[in-house]
């Protein structure tokens, strides 16, 4: 017997929607005030109720990077990218964090994807060049 499976999506109540909106706005404002740890805590509440909220994942990643929590930031960027792979800024920011970690080849790969999605992305172009130069320095030293 073959069963047909369907994905069950949680339907939020109006109260939960209000809670998500409240914590998202609160997180965004904390970020503007440079209270990144508080922002991350609020994004966690948003994500708990709406795990596919790719903007919350992206913003959380950005605030984690600002706290120098690079591994956690990359993990969050990966989720955001999985949920919304066509946003060039997601790839660019992940590349920037990888660049900070001296993961030059991985950074270049992210910038390449970003530039395929948005060939005019000046930030991706600039930092791709920087990552390639740093990558070249490593090869010259060995």
Predicted segment positions?
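Conserved structural position within tetratricopeptide repeats
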Residues: 47-48, 79-82, 115-116
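TPR-adjacent "capping" and linker segments in tetratricopeptide-repeat scaffold/adaptor proteins
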Residues: 4-22
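Helix-start (N-cap) detector for alpha-helical repeat units in TPR-like alpha-solenoids
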Residues: 20, 54-55, 88-89, 122-123
């Amino acid at each position: 017997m073959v069963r047909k499976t369907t994905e069950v999506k949680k339907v939020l109540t109006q109260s939960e929607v209000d809670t998500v909106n409240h914590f998202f706005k609160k997180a965004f404002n904390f970020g503007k005030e440079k209270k990144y740890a508080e922002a991350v805590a609020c994004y966690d509440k948003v994500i708990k109720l709406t795990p596919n909220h790719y903007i919350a994942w992206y913003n959380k990643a950005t605030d984690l990077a600002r706290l120098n929590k690079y591994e956690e930031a990359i993990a969050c960027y990966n989720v955001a990218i999985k949920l919304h792979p066509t946003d060039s800024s997601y790839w660019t920011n992940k590349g920037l964090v990888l660049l900070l970690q001296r993961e030059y080849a991985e950074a270049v790969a992210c910038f390449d994807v970003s530039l395929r999605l948005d060939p005019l992305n000046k930030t991706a172009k600039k930092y791709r060049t920087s990552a390639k130069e740093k990558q070249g320095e490593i090869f010259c030293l060995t």
